[in-house]
C-alpha cells in the first residue's frame, strides 16, 4: 500500500496536467511549426518554461487503482502485477485464467 500523501499528490498532478494541457499543446505546436518565426519560437519556449512544473504529463505516475502501488503497473488492467495475480487466482478478472500446456 502506497502512502496516502503520494496517491493524493499524483491525483493533484492529474488535475494540473488536465488544466494546462491545451495551453501546452498550443505552445508546442508553435515551436514545431515551420512557418513560425524565431521570435515566436523563442517566446513560446519561454512561455512553456513559465508553466507549472507539474503541468507536464511526464510527471504523472501510473499507480495501481486498488492500493496505489507505483511499480509493476499493467496498463491493460490498471493494476499492479501482484494485484492482477491475486485477482486472477480468485477469478475476479473476466477472461483471465491460468495458462496450462
Swiss-Prot record:
Compositionally biased residues, Basic and acidic residues: 28-44, 61-70
Could you cite one Gene Ontology molecular function of this protein? rRNA binding
Region Disordered, as annotated, extends over 28-74
One Gene Ontology term, aspect cellular component:
small ribosomal subunit
Q: Which UniProt keywords apply?
A: Ribonucleoprotein, Ribosomal protein, RNA-binding, rRNA-binding
Query: Has keyword Cell division?
Result: no
Q: Which InterPro entries match?
A: Ribosomal_uS14 (IPR001209), Ribosomal_uS14_bac/plastid (IPR023036)
Which Pfam families does UniProt cross-reference here? Ribosomal_S14
Q: Name one GO biological process term.
A: translation
Q: What does this protein do?
A: Binds 16S rRNA, required for the assembly of 30S particles and may also be responsible for determining the conformation of the 16S rRNA at the A site.
Spell out the family assignment given in the record's similarity comment: Belongs to the universal ribosomal protein uS14 family.
The record ties this protein, via PANTHER family, to: 30S RIBOSOMAL PROTEIN S14 (PTHR19836), SMALL RIBOSOMAL SUBUNIT PROTEIN US14A (PTHR19836:SF23)
Q: How does this polypeptide assemble, per the annotation?
A: Part of the 30S ribosomal subunit. Contacts proteins S3 and S10.
Q: What is this protein called?
A: Small ribosomal subunit protein uS14A
Q: What organism is the protein native to?
A: Rhodococcus jostii (strain RHA1)
Q: Which gene specifies this protein's sequence?
A: rpsN
Amino acid at each position: 500500500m502506497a502512502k496516502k500523501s503520494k496517491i493524493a499528490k499524483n491525483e493533484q498532478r492529474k488535475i494540473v496536467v488536465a488544466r494546462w494541457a491545451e495551453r501546452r499543446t498550443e505552445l508546442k505546436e508553435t515551436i514545431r511549426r515551420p512557418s513560425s518565426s524565431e521570435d515566436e519560437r523563442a517566446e513560446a519556449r519561454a512561455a512553456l518554461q513559465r508553466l507549472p512544473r507539474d503541468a507536464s504529463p511526464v510527471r504523472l505516475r501510473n499507480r495501481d487503482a486498488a492500493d496505489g502501488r507505483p511499480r509493476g503497473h499493467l496498463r491493460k488492467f490498471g493494476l499492479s502485477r501482484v494485484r492482477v495475480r491475486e485477482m486472477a487466482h480468485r477469478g475476479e478478472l473476466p477472461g483471465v485464467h491460468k495458462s496450462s500446456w
